């Protein structure tokens, strides 16, 4: 089984990204919390001691290289028959160095055509967010980091929001906001105000981007929200509503969509994970993708109905006594190395475009 997967992966890497472009196509967008992708170096200004060769997690070169290839395997598996995922939001990466290694130590760099941008935030552990993008289908226009400073807690330090803007093949402008909202440490209710504040900032940013746009400017907010989509931080502060898809692949009437942002709810059912994260048998949709209303109207760039899914392949999970569905195959359980991919499953959507 492993050899067959390796052969298919090699053929895909050699051929998949080289098919000709046509006037119509699709972009694959992913969001993936990769669980603590640290390098092997000690950064004294950050609390990264656990992830050093002599640290509590025994983070060795062999384990690091294995992790890089596992991430590459997931991304390669999530591509289509014609190309790799076009835009990949990565959560829990330490710095630009690990992304350079991801592209240079695995087949991704030679075949996928990725470039990247990553934050350099104030998180105490040095955790950041990043975006991989295929330069063939996303022309970078600009990027900036948006630091979160809480007026009610000036000492709190967390990950910034990454805003990336680019042109897609339709000629439309797509703004992506990659986020890793404050954790639930200290309790969900006690920490909720931090996530609410972050969502308020996101709402202000996205509203400003969409104001006065002529329908060819779009927004995606994606990443790890450290909370379910129905929680107040998302529903109230971000102002995002669940997108109820119509049957038959047709878009709901535009005048029925009143919010600016909609959560693209992943498909549920047999063979689909109940959530992206499982803790003691309880599944949660911590990872989310929210789209602007402009992507739901059937324009030159539009969301493909029914394409939102929790991306899962059997090699990414493992059996658990606490869940009837395989749970994510983690890299670590506490300080114990399990050798898996991540403690999250990624999300994947498709956007259809028409060239002008």
Segments predicted by a language model, with ranges:
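Bacterial N-terminal signal peptides
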Residues: 8-18
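N-terminal, active-site-proximal structural segment of metallo-dependent hydrolase catalytic domains
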Residues: 21-111, 117-129, 200, 317-325, ...
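Catalytic metal-binding/acid-base residues of hydrolase active sites
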Residues: 35, 94, 182, 225-228, ...
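Second-shell loop/turn segments in exported
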Residues: 53-64, 84-91, 118-119, 150-151, ...
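Structured beta-strand-rich core segments of catalytic domains in phosphoester-bond hydrolases
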Residues: 93-173, 177-181
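A long, amphipathic alpha-helix that forms part
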Residues: 192-214
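Metal-dependent phosphoester-hydrolase catalytic domains
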Residues: 206-220, 227-356
């Amino acid at each position: 089984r492993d050899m067959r997967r390796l052969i298919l992966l090699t053929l895909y890497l050699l051929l998949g990204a080289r098919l000709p472009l046509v006037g119509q196509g699709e972009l694959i967008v992913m969001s993936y919390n990769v669980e603590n992708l640290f390098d092997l170096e000690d950064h004294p200004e950050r609390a990264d001691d656990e992830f050093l060769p002599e640290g509590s997690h025994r983070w060795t070169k062999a384990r690091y290289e294995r992790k890089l290839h596992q991430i590459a395997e997931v991304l390669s598996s999530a591509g289509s028959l014609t190309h790799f995922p076009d835009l990949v939001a990565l959560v829990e990466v330490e710095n630009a160095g690990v992304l350079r290694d991801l592209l240079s130590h695995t087949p991704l760099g030679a075949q996928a055509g990725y470039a990247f941008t990553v934050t350099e935030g104030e998180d105490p552990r040095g955790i950041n967010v990043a975006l991989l993008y295929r330069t063939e289908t996303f022309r970078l226009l600009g990027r900036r980091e948006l630091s979160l400073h809480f007026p009610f807690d000036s000492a709190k330090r967390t990950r910034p929001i990454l805003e990336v803007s680019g042109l897609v093949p339709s000629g439309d402008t797509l703004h992506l906001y990659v986020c890793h909202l404050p954790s639930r440490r200290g309790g969900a209710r006690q920490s909720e105000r931090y996530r609410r504040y972050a969502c308020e900032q996101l709402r202000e940013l996205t509203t400003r981007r969409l104001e006065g746009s002529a329908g060819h400017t779009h927004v995606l907010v994606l990443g790890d929200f450290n909370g379910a989509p129905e929680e107040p931080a998302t529903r109230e502060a971000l102002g995002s509503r669940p997108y109820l898809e119509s049957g038959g692949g047709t878009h709901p009437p535009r005048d029925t969509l009143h919010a600016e942002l909609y959560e693209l709810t992943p498909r549920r059912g047999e063979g689909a994970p109940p959530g992206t994260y499982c803790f003691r048998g309880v599944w949660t949709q911590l990872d989310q993708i929210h789209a602007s209303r402009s992507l739901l109207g059937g324009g030159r760039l539009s969301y493909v109905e029914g394409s939102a899914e929790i991306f899962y392949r059997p090699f990414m999970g493992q059996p658990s006594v606490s869940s009837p569905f395989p749970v994510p195959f983690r890299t670590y359980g506490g300080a114990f190395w399990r050798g898996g991919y991540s403690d999250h499953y990624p999300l994947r959507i498709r956007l259809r475009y028409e060239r002008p």
